[in-house]
Amino acid sequence: MKKFRFFVSGMPGVGKTTLAKRIADEIKREGFKVGGIITQEIRSGARRSGFRVIALDTGEIGRLAYVGQGYPRLGRYVIDVESFEKVAIPAISRALREGDLIVIDEIGPMEFKSNEFLKALGLVLRSEKPLLATVHRRFVERYRPLGEYYWLTPENREAVFSEILVKIKELLRENENAGNKAQD
């Protein structure tokens, strides 16, 4: 299996999570196994009140962050490390074992409050599994050298979606064919 990683970054609200979810859904429709996590905003009216993490394979939901009192903090958010790890770490572990594609949304400062997440991310980056990850803009330079990198904008998001989707499909088909040849 050939190593291939896709990293997507951009400003908040540009559509990084939407892109990751759309690609995951398309790859699943092709019959491949997709695992990992998606992070979504929690809103109270027009205001963001936190973030949840969702396991792509099971749909299990955990809380990543909320507005309130407590520690650890990032800005106005309290990071719920325990709830995040309860969903994210098993989801990433399953993706490493069983998935054809690993999706991690997001590699960012909230997630970095979890040492277990950092360990799991290290395992993913050392693995042979294809990876699609969204990266907080502060961490672009750290991850840019590790794979193909895209800066998402409202103007290019459809083109970036199409380009990454085509490349991942090609990669997964190559890996599938290589696996079939090895079994012959």
Curated annotation (Swiss-Prot):
It comes from the Archaea. Keywords: ATP-binding, Hydrolase, Nucleotide-binding. GO terms for molecular function: ATP binding; ATP hydrolysis activity. Its EC number is 3.6.1.15. Gene3D superfamilies: P-loop containing nucleotide triphosphate hydrolases. It catalyses: a ribonucleoside 5'-triphosphate + H2O = a ribonucleoside 5'-diphosphate + phosphate + H(+). ATP binds at residues 10-17, 101-108. Signal peptide: none annotated. Pfam families: NTPase_1. InterPro entries: AAA+_ATPase (IPR003593), Nuc-triphosphatase_THEP1 (IPR004948), P-loop_NTPase (IPR027417). Belongs to the THEP1 NTPase family. NCBIfam families: PRK13695.1. Has nucleotide phosphatase activity towards ATP, GTP, CTP, TTP and UTP. May hydrolyze nucleoside diphosphates with lower efficiency. This is Nucleoside-triphosphatase THEP1. The lineage of its organism: Archaea, Methanobacteriati, Methanobacteriota, Thermococci, Thermococcales.
